[in-house]
Amino acid sequence: MDVNPTLLFLKVPAQNAISTTFPYTGDPPYSHGTGTGYTMDTVNRTHQYSERGKWTTNTETGAPQLNPIDGPLPEDNEPTGYAQTDCVLEAMAFLEKSHPGIFENSCLETMEVVQQTRVDKLTQGRQTFDWTLNRNQPAATALANTIEVFRLNGLTANESGRLIDFLKDVMESMDKEEMEIVTHFQRKRRVRDNMTKKMVTQRTIGRKKQKLHKRSYIIRALTLNTMTKDAERGKLKRRAIATPGMQIRGFVYFVETLARSICEKLEQSGLPVGGNEKKAKLANVVRKMMTNSQDTELSFTITGDNTKWNENQNPRMFLAMITYITRNQPEWFRNVLSIAPIMFSNKMARLGKGYMFESKNMKLRTQIPAEMLSGIDLRYFNDSTRKKIEKIRPLLIDGAASLSPGMMMGMFNMLSTVLGVSILNLGQKEYTKTAYWWDGLQSSDDFALIVNAPNHEGIQAGVDRFYRTCKLLGINMSKKKSYINRTGTFEFTSFFYRYGFVANFSMELPSFGVSGINESADMSIGVTVIKNNMINNDLGPATAQMALQLFIKDYRYTYRCHRGDTQIQTRRSFEIKKLWDQTRSKAGLLVSDGGPNLYNIRNLHIPEVCLKWELMDKDYQGRLCNPLNPFVSHKEVESVNNAVVMPSHGPAKTMEYDAVATTHSWVPKRNRSILNTSQRGILEDEQMYQKCCNLFEKFFPSSSYRRPVGISSMVEAMVSRARIDARIDFESGRIKKEDFAEIMKICSTIEDLRRQK
């Protein structure tokens, strides 16, 4: 049957059709090859925007650095990074005037966090540049390697596990004349395989010690590794993102904690909230502007876009902001917070893997590592690459480019939001002192600006003033990409507003479908996604019912678990049919065991096992949920698990789903081949961390989790906890005297062992 697609939209208001224009179905584009070219683009662009700044040379590393702060005022609309210090400080002062005590209170909150945060905070996060191996590693491993090397060099402040002590080590490490590090190297040798008698190449990974001179160490500590951002939709060109090393991470964390605390108190900030909370904040600002624009005033909204936000921001400006925000605070606190921007003013961008060359007849492939780009003959490269390399050469040191201006993506989202909000704050009538005034929203580099004025000229004047104010703070509103509408229709962080928010359903499309964790989790996540979209995204009952049927179909094809009475033949159908035939109550079988689907849109909140429990045969119940069954996952499954779902923009978000432990909640085993590589030690470390953390959680269930006070090791904390719990259990009669004695004996043994060690 042919359907004329326009018919679908006859009943739909135009704004609701927005979701059909989004590039969110199908696989997103991924990058291949190296990010070297993209990184060079970033470095060169950043310097171009600030080209009229002052050049200096870093005394420690010898890197040339460009400082655009207080540079020339713009004469045209081209993007520039010349922020004016006095303007930024004044904007901060006005922000504080409008919100009395905001900086003071945020500083106090942050101070508390600084004193309490443990160093394991740095194990969160994905890939981190590991300066000891000069490549990316999982965060926990990179931290472990850093601490190991610090110990090797006599730095032990981090033993107590406070992040602030680890940061003291970082500062001390910068003063050392040389640092000894442990790094890996590969040995290849040909050996005869016993089984097949063929020759094979065996790779062994050795660890060797190496000394780094002060200059080399400081360069590594200031290095951000770069990669290509993957899975970005709606873009033709890829772009580079950065991952900092462990020396920078902790300092950034504290700065962002302070900035987050400030953002939480600002009604114009789109961070750190999200989802419905963000929509409510937004709606409030719009309501305020609409209500105040009585019949006498016009109100217009700009859906704003800034040109190259990161590349025009400047760490020196952030330093000025922090200096102002913390001006009445203790010296140590001000120092800790000012280190991150100082390190970023001296950062180096690693150029990644370098370039791959292939000879015409495809026989030879060779890689030119980034380290060689400073000296190689340029005739091998095409024109555009040659230009890039020529431009970047003066900035290169050991395969990294000196990049003083600019911020790299996603490093100081909160702090840059504070800067943006400070301009929105200046739009109040008492500050503009004219007929026009403005307000709006800021979320990192995205903004919406609402301008009110008696007439069109006033609106234009207000927009111009906003634009110029932004320029003074190093923010470049793009006149080409921003557009203006009557207030009531605009877009902000992919939320579309038209007299209220329009559900942009296409954004959620990537999270529908089978996640591929295991049969139990996938069923649960699938129905939870549908449920959540009915609540939050205008997914109507008919569409939800259809989504559910499609999901069940998808699920059955993924796990080859078609109904027991189906004609479809798969590898599992023989077993499933056998089970179907010997089951009395067929409705009780889980979908993954060939049972029927009992879900409809009314019962999506109930886990499948619970939904069907009463319908199950007794022996099926026993097999499915028997903890003695070796196939029932022995991990203690919390009643709520977290899945990672991919919304179309922003980071992957976690979503809670109900988890019931059955034979279907298996955890796949790791691929064995990792055990023969350099990663093996890392894997063992990871497992050890995991075991220690699990054990610790057993002693301190989240409900009673108090941070161990004072400087006690994990073991000491657990032993003292065990003693307290045992005493309470003994006195209340929950355990016998013998058990109590046994526990006390074990605790003493552990302490003796620690003393001997």
Swiss-Prot record:
PROSITE patterns listed in its UniProt record: RDRP_SSRNA_NEG_SEG
InterPro entries reported for this sequence: RNA-dir_pol_NSvirus (IPR007099), RNA_pol_PB1_influenza (IPR001407)
Keywords: Eukaryotic host gene expression shutoff by virus, Eukaryotic host transcription shutoff by virus, Host cytoplasm, Host gene expression shutoff by virus, Host nucleus, Host-virus interaction, Inhibition of host RNA polymerase II by virus, Nucleotide-binding, Nucleotidyltransferase, Phosphoprotein, RNA-directed RNA polymerase, Transferase, Viral RNA replication, Viral transcription
Composition bias, Polar residues: 55-64
Nucleus is among the record's keywords: no
Signal sequence residues: none
Chain positions covered by the region annotation Promoter-binding site: 249-256
Pfam family, one: Flu_PB1
PTM note: Phosphorylated by host PRKCA.
GO MF, any single term: RNA binding
GO annotation, cellular component aspect: host cell cytoplasm; host cell nucleus
The RdRp catalytic domain, residue ranges: 286-483
Protein family membership: Belongs to the influenza viruses polymerase PB1 family.
Subunit structure: Influenza RNA polymerase is composed of three subunits: PB1, PB2 and PA. Interacts (via N-terminus) with PA (via C-terminus). Interacts (via C-terminus) with PB2 (via N-terminus); this interaction is essential for transcription initiation. Interacts (via C-terminus) with human PKP2 (via N-terminus); the interaction competitively inhibits the interaction between the RNA polymerase subunits PB1 and PB2.
Protein name (record): RNA-directed RNA polymerase catalytic subunit
Phylogenetic classification of the source organism: Viruses, Riboviria, Orthornavirae, Negarnaviricota, Polyploviricotina
Gene responsible for this protein: PB1
